[in-house]
Amino acid sequence: MNAFDRLFTEATPLIRQGLHQRESAPVDGGRWPVSVVLRPDRAAAERLEQAMTEVEEYAGSGHFRTGVADSVHFTVRALETFRETVDEEAVRRYAAAMHRAAAGVESIGLDLVGLTLAPGSVMVCAHPVDDNGERFMDLLGDELGDDAWREAGLRRDIWYASILHFAADIAMPAGLIEWVAQRRELSLGRTATDTAELVRFHYEDGPSGRLMRPEILDSVRAGQFGQDNSRQTKAGLM
């Protein structure tokens, strides 16, 4: 049994009984902090959004629609807890560390190998096609130094994108469980990215539903730290 299997096994009884985790709008000190993420390529992002739309037929409304194509992502590392106003000096340090780490890796490829349930979400499961993703994760932790405190001692051992975060009752729990179970090994293709992004998240509740929109504070292409180092981030000078 792998980690994705264990998550499915853990989540199933919680969802069936209505005891699943529920997201709420972020507050200072909570989830959805400044993070380093990878985005799927556009074609893959559209496939993941389609999967989210199908999930919603069973989950119902009121959940966080994190699988929309311009929001879906793979988290490399969370860097702090949520705060409404970002610390510009911290952002400069995070960006510099991300650039240095990216210099040591090439494009990161992920095979999207199926869906699973977690206590608070529906996930797309991914397997790295080589060691670039793991190397970037390790290099980033090293380059952050003291700024690596948020995930100190934590080793992310799976790659995933959450396409729906539960935030309300699930309309058809049994139907959702069965639907995901039938797609545990559904191939959603391969995605590759040569760009890492430093992002913060903004909560929206509007005509498109409840969203967590990433705002790009900085980005860097793999192996190109030396070429980008002099440019500005959205939060200020590097």
What are these regions (language model features)?
Residues 1-238:
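Histidine-dependent nucleotide/RNA phosphoesterase domain, centered on the 2H-phosphoesterase fold
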